[in-house]
């Protein structure tokens, strides 16, 4: 009985801590960076989505996942790299959040897709950053095909976001939101090839949205195979 009572108060303590963290971070992001969302389509006009979707975005800053979750605050889960979840700096929180879907980005992992599918079936949108990591030189990394596989296998629309990635006090972080699109199977095209083509299509789409968010139109993004690897300074490795 004593142990159960003790565990109850421990669980309650962590729930209160996590609530404070979630609402504290959200308030900070919304107040100091004052995000401005521009909805370009006719289907989605607010973050109150009428159906669960696969939400994708470019990954320019470590704050991007927090910002997207702060904006799409209700009925959403997010795919997070397993190594980030196991990092002692973040594990105390990430392992306790029920909306976090772990994904092994270094090995073949299909379990995350099964969990994500269940989340969509429950009515929760799934946030994915297809690049898998931040890129700081202005380009986009290759989009992994997992999001396309999830969208195609479940029928959930893909909602593309373009984030300017600028988080400075005095600057309003710009987010462009496009019309959602579905990914359907195409007869005669191998599954892997089709997913790769769709992933590149959405990569280019997110790139254009990001450029619009930055107010820079006309810049061309090379296809994944021709995009050079990012050169990372030694002190940042």
Regions from the language model: what does each represent?
Residues 2-5, 9-12, 16, 111-237:
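Non-catalytic C-terminal accessory region of glycerolipid acyltransferases
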Residues 3-33, 91, 95-96:
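Short hydrophobic helices that act as membrane-entry/anchoring signals
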Residues 22-59:
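Helix-to-loop junction immediately C-terminal to a conserved catalytic motif
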Residues 30, 72, 94-95, 119, ...:
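A generic structural signal for well-ordered alpha-helical segments
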Residues 34-38, 107-113:
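Glycine-rich, highly charged phosphate/nucleotide-binding loops
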Residues 35, 75-77, 98, 124, ...:
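A structural micro-motif
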Residues 47-107:
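Catalytic core of membrane glycerolipid acyltransferases/transacylases, capturing the structured
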């Amino acid at each position: 009985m004593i142990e159960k009572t003790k565990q109850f108060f421990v669980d309650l303590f962590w729930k209160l801590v996590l609530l404070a963290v979630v609402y504290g971070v959200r308030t900070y992001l919304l107040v100091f960076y004052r995000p401005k969302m521009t909805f370009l389509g006719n289907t989605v006009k607010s973050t109150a989505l009428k159906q669960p979707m696969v939400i994708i975005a470019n990954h320019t800053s470590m704050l991007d996942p927090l910002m997207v979750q702060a904006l799409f605050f209700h009925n959403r889960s997010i795919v997070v790299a397993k190594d980030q979840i196991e990092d002692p700096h973040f594990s105390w929180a990430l392992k306790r959040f029920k909306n976090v879907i772990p994904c092994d980005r270094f090995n073949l992992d299909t379990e995350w897709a099964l969990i994500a599918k269940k989340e969509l079936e429950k009515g929760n949108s799934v946030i994915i950053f297809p690049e898998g990591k931040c890129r700081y030189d202005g380009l986009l990394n290759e989009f992994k095909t997992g999001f396309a596989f999830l969208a195609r296998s479940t029928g959930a629309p893909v909602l593309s976001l373009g984030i300017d990635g600028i988080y400075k006090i005095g600057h309003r972080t710009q987010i462009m939101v496009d019309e959602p699109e579905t990914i359907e199977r195409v007869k005669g095209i191998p599954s892997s090839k089709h997913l790769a083509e769709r992933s590149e299509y959405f990569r280019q789409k997110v790139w254009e949205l990001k450029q619009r968010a930055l107010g820079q139109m006309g810049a061309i993004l090379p296809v994944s195979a021709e995009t050079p690897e990012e050169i990372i300074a030694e002190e940042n490795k």
